[in-house]
């Protein structure tokens, strides 16, 4: 009964999203039936550095597949926000996943470990493992291993930007085949992200939860991701609001400028109004535009086939 109600909610949401993101003619077409999401642990035998076996100690991926899974599809790993202390799994996880499904994109919502129990590099290790997992199992899931992106909101945006600036090609000699896969995302989508951990416009709560009360200044600089961008940083789409008083828009602006300086393809949209944590604001006349322009960016960049 619970599963039936859950599926009914997913189908109802899919109907709304499908109507919102198609032409009037296509809006009359019945919404596609989305598959029931499945959740898997990132590590079968327990996560490295785990301090217990509770839910909070077990990073997972919840898999949302679009109706057609013939592939090869684009995939996006979603990192919800929550100041590195909680996770907005609905507004910044499930709803974006459902939207991506309407574009034919496979979505994977990441439940990563959080402060104050866990600090860096645990969170980075979790998202890197997620990227490796999707890439290593790309054939099984009908995914193009060269079209795997990350989407992060707020603190999850910081984590996605960290994955975009701190990655490796994998360990070819690893016994675990997942560890042989590279952790570089092919593109990044950052929604009102925390970027700096050193400037006045940082989000102090996210910084403290990630690094602890007495953060090493050198580590804070290394994880201020606008200072870590190179020509190999993946193409990036950013959106923010000028009215955001929780995570000031300077975070996105300085990241964009660093991408531009490095010659990395990037697009940024700054909306005049809107509070922090918008997620998928389908009823907001202004902010409801960001998923539409994101879809255009994905197509223009060749990330949608």
Predicted features, each with a name:
Residues 29-70:
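N-terminal cap/lid segment of alpha/beta-hydrolase-fold proteins
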Residues 80-85, 242:
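Active-site glycine-rich loops that stabilize anionic/oxyanionic intermediates
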Residues 129-206, 220, 225:
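Primarily recognizes the serine-hydrolase "nucleophile elbow" in alpha/beta-hydrolase
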Residues 10-22:
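Bacterial N-terminal signal peptides
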Residues 88-90, 94-95, 108-145, 282-289:
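Catalytic nucleophile-loop/oxyanion-hole region of alpha/beta-hydrolase
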Residues 238-240, 244:
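Short beta-strand/loop motif that positions the catalytic acidic residue
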Residues 72-81:
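Short beta-strand element of the alpha/beta-hydrolase
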Residues 64, 239, 249-305:
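C-terminal catalytic histidine-bearing segment of alpha/beta-hydrolase fold enzymes
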């Amino acid at each position: 009964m619970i599963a039936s109600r859950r599926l009914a909610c997913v189908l109802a949401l899919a109907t709304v999203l499908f109507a919102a993101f198609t032409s009037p003619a296509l809006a009359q077409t019945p919404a596609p039936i989305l598959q029931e999401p499945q959740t898997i642990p990132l590590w079968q035998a327990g996560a490295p550095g785990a301090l217990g076996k509770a839910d909070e100690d077990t990073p997972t991926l919840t898999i949302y597949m679009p109706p057609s899974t013939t592939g090869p599809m684009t995939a996006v790993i979603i990192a919800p926000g929550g100041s590195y202390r909680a996770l907005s799994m609905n507004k910044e996880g499930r709803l974006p996943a459902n939207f991506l499904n309407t574009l034919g994109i496979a979505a994977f919502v990441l439940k990563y470990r959080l402060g104050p129990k866990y600090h860096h590099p645990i969170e980075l290790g979790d998202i890197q493992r997620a990227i490796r997992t999707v890439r290593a199992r790309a054939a099984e899931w009908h995914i193009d291993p060269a079209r795997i992106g990350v989407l992060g909101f707020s603190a999850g945006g910081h984590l996605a930007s960290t994955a975009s600036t701190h990655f490796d090609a994998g360990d070819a000699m690893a016994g675990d085949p997942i560890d042989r896969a590279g952790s570089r995302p092919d593109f990044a989508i950052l929604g009102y992200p925390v970027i700096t951990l050193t400037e006045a416009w940082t989000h102090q709560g996210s910084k403290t939860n990630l690094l602890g009360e007495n953060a090493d200044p050198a580590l804070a600089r290394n994880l201020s991701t606008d200072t870590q961008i190179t020509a190999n940083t993946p193409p990036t789409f950013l959106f923010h609001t000028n009215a955001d008083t929780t995570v000031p828009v300077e975070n996105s602006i300085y990241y964009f400028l660093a991408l531009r300086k490095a010659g990395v393809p990037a697009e940024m949209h700054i909306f005049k109004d809107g509070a922090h944590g918008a997620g998928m604001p389908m009823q907001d006349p202004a902010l409801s535009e960001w998923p539409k322009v994101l879809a255009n960016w994905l197509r223009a960049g060749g990330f949608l086939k």
